[in-house]
Amino acid sequence: GVEPTGAASMKASLEAGRVVTLDKISTIADGVAVKTPGGQVFPYIQKNLDGVIAIDDGELVDAFLDVMEKHKMVVENAGLLTIAALKHLDFQGQNVVSVLSGGNMDVITISSLVQHGLINRGRIFTFSVQLPDRPGELLRIADLVARQNGNIIKLDHNQFVNINRQ
């Protein structure tokens, strides 16, 4: 089985040997975020499941970016749990099926996941510099970024921030 670390109620229940209720839950996989697993399904899971892999939100962000970039698919976070879990398993030489489900995401959430995924992988980052208010200083920074094969996605420039206002 697999569930998010921030809502690992089944894992906690299996470890306790009984259904337990978590005090709180916190995960981006809201489709599977439950404090208490179902009492009717618990005995079946307890009897038939080898274990539960807990996936943190960072792993879900990475899985989202992988699926979007490599397969051009939008899969909601709960549906990505099985993809993220594959990195925890040794299945070399075996056939594996992973069910991808749900694409119910708004574009702001998609944008946020892409940005966090790129940041997590070191593909984008933010930096801040204070420059003298002279012509060419901004060009000097842009040239430095370009020489490193970088690209500037967003630039905030306030030439008045350094003025001495005594």
Residue ranges and their predicted role:
Residues G1-T21:
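Glycine/threonine-rich beta-strand-loop-alpha-helix active-site module
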Residues E3-A8, I28, T36, G58-L60, ...:
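Glycine-rich beta-alpha junction loops
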Residues K11, D57-G58, V74-A78, N151-N158:
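Flexible, glycine/charged-enriched surface loops at secondary-structure junctions
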Residues E15-T21, H71-M73, H116:
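Short, hinge-like loop/turn segments at secondary-structure boundaries
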Residues G17-G31:
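N-terminal glycine-rich dinucleotide-binding loop that anchors FAD/FMN and/or NAD(P) in oxidoreductases
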Residues G38-Q94:
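Active-site-adjacent helical/loop segments in soluble small-molecule enzymes
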Residues K87-Q115:
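Catalytic phosphate/nucleotide-handling subdomain of diverse soluble enzymes
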Residues V107-Q166:
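A conserved regulatory-domain signal marking ACT and ACT-like small-molecule sensing domains
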